[in-house]
Amino acid sequence: MFYQVLHSILSLTAVLLNAFTMYLAITKSPKIMRPCSAIITIKTATDILTSIMSFFVMQRIITDGSTILVIPTGPCINFGKTACYVGHMLMLCFLEYNLIWMISSYIFRYYILYVRQPSIKKLVFVAFCLSIPSIIHMVVWFSIYDPNEASTYLPLFGSCDMVLSGKIVYWSAITLITQLFITAFLVIVAYIWIKETLCSYATKMGAIKKDVKNFNKRLVKVINFQVFLPSFIFLGVITFASMFTGKIGYEYAQYAISVIFMFSPIISPFSYILFVPHYKNVITGKVKNPKSKPTKCNPPISTTRSTGAPFVYNI
């Protein structure tokens, strides 16, 4: 019972935080920041879907290396094993897509710095294209899943009717968890690359570009904060691997994996709320005076763009 309550609180918190961040991105972003707001909106939408699926399943994962048991305890149990399996797979899929979108957002930032701002239509198109492999992957697993497949397991793990097991559950879980680990590692690689790019860009700007350099520093703070998000994926995967290899017992580890994964969508919104000035001002109640003199935090908005200088609002 405590696990369900904790899971519900974490899921609800993640949904509310990401919904609020999405609201800020859609309604409080200036026109010049629209592409950036689209990137944030897509990421928060993915986090919301992850949280909803996590609440829907409320899964415990148990493994001894030879078998993997997924024990759902959420609302999905009212709809049967297939619904629980779909929710289990979608939650892992959304977690992976979230990491993929983080990598894409780093590439977009590079594109904004050195080329030009992508249109919102292009961003949505890219987001859709990135989702196609995951959709195909999920459809394949769903089509071959057999809820009636028999498997041996210890009765104390849970009710016979609400334990997902068998070869399909085993290999689909192994595949997605491995993909999560690889994708999280690629996020770290992309982070190192984009941070070096931003630092190099700031050096090249020179003293006359202090406003741009100031916002560039804010951008570095955003990605420095976001680099902690894959650490929750790493920790969850390591917990699973330790239980898989028998290094730790299942008594507590079965609850830890899903709970650890949930901290990623909970923490993610703060990278924007804390470091994007327009969103932070909404929280603190600051009202920007349009007649105030330009400062480092309020550079004048120009309709023209000098060569090599990005729009400073793209965080």
From Swiss-Prot:
Superkingdom as given in the UniProt entry: Eukaryota
Main location: membrane
Record keywords: Membrane, Transmembrane, Transmembrane helix
Topology of the protein relative to the lipid bilayer: Multi-pass membrane protein
Statement: the UniProt record of this protein carries the keyword Kinase: no
CC per GO annotation: membrane
Transmembrane segments: 6-26, 38-58, 83-103, 124-144, 174-194, 225-245, 256-276
Pfam families in UniProt: 7TM_GPCR_Srd
Compartments (UniProt record): Membrane
Similarity field: Belongs to the nematode receptor-like protein srd family.
Protein known as: Serpentine receptor class delta-31
Source organism per UniProt: Caenorhabditis elegans
